[in-house]
Amino acid sequence: RLQACASMDHFWGERKWLDILGITKRDYKAFLQEQRPLSDTSITSLADYLDVSADEIQQGTVDFRAVSTQKGDGDKVLPEPYSIAAFGRLRTTITSFDYIEERLGWRVRADTLRHFRINEAVLSDYMAPTNMRVITDLALYMQTKHNMSDSQLFHMGMHSSVGNRNTLIGAVLSTARDITEAYAIYIDELAKFFENNLRYTITLLREDRCTLEAVSYRYVAEALGVRHLGNKQVCAIRAGMLASVPHYLDQPQASVTEPLCVHRGDSVCRYEIKFPHVASL
């Protein structure tokens, strides 16, 4: 994993990696197959290069993301296509990559970051501005390249409550008196604070359910050269995020459906949200 984090898992990178370790390719293969250990000299040399301690390498406590940030390929700022018309934040992208690693492993996370030319350093700031292209491209890529189903994308969205629990979102929502108030805060205050890509309108809010409609702001869509922001995959992620709101109150997830969607030809994306005590009946 350290080799991949340092972006040395390609031909020329591997040669440099072997030079750092001071061993042959054959010896390295034997190490990977657990047929021989790395020498203290190799470990010390690697630790010096990665700016970590030899003990961290031997004990498996290296901060892999820190290594990727310092040594990995990719720009340490968002690539230009994801920086124009940046009316959103990176928080959803960050929690989505965390879900990818949890479900598919660190290799898929690393390969996906490399595909988009994004360095781990970019994913250290939840408040960093971005546009909707990055999550749109990521969601489509995960479905086409890694066969993620709509259900898995939904769970990717739900995973946001895990990553956000110790952030401003978690702090604010955990103080809500009940689920109804939590949704009102999430949609009317937090969503509008964190992004200005879509107009969110609550058309119904009762003690047992909520109806939400979302429409792209025209000026943002035009700036990105699209009619509607996002895609059906992003809608699945958003549905999962909406379902996770009760988690901030330590309650089960809500039931969320999307009967109307602009990506299916409708004029709005409409989400019908049934609160957990109703969904469980």
PLM features per residue range, with description:
Residues 1-16, 20, 95:
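A short, Lys/Arg-rich alpha-helix, primarily the initiator
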Residues 124-234, 260:
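Amphipathic interaction/junction segments at domain boundaries or subunit interfaces
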Residues 54-83, 157:
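Short amphipathic recognition helices of helix-turn-helix/homeodomain-type DNA-binding modules
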Residues 22-38:
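Recognition helix of helix-turn-helix/homeodomain-like DNA-binding domains
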Residues 39, 59, 198-239, 249-281:
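Short terminal or interdomain "cap/linker" segment that borders an active site or interface and mediates
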Residues 16, 27, 56:
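Residues in the helix-turn-helix
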Residues 41-57:
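DNA major-groove recognition helix of helix-turn-helix/homeodomain DNA-binding modules
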